[in-house]
Amino acid sequence: MSEMQQTRNGSVALSKDVLVPSVQRIGRREIEITYLGTNSAGQATWIMWNADDPHLIGMLSQGKMGYHFEQRTSTGVMLHENISLSRVQRALGG
């Protein structure tokens, strides 16, 4: 799959095309997501940006038991560990 796309049931599928940004609508937000490759721990890693007003939303990596999402907020960083992709979507307001 060349882009992160919503499947028929509304869940999200992530692209693994390295450094190819795609825009995904999650809730009312347009989010640009780019696969960076694997991190030093060998985990697939994506970066998320606000597509309308360029600022960092967070980093997502795929762990052994779920996803790790480091979310930037107005009050600091929130770290969500070992969560499902649907939970990431809810954290983003979708």
Language-model segments: what does each one mean?
Residues M1-A51:
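Negatively charged, low-complexity tracts enriched in Asp/Glu with abundant Ser/Thr
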Residues Q6-T7, S22, H55, E81, ...:
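Generic low-complexity segments that are intrinsically disordered, proline-rich and/or Lys/Arg-biased
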Residues Y35-N39, S61-Y67, I83-R90:
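A short, sequence-level motif marking secondary-structure junctions
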Residues A44-T73:
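A short, structured beta-strand/loop element
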Residues T73-I83:
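A short, exposed loop/beta-hairpin motif centered on an aromatic-Gly-Thr core
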Residues G93-G94:
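Charged, low-complexity intrinsically disordered segments
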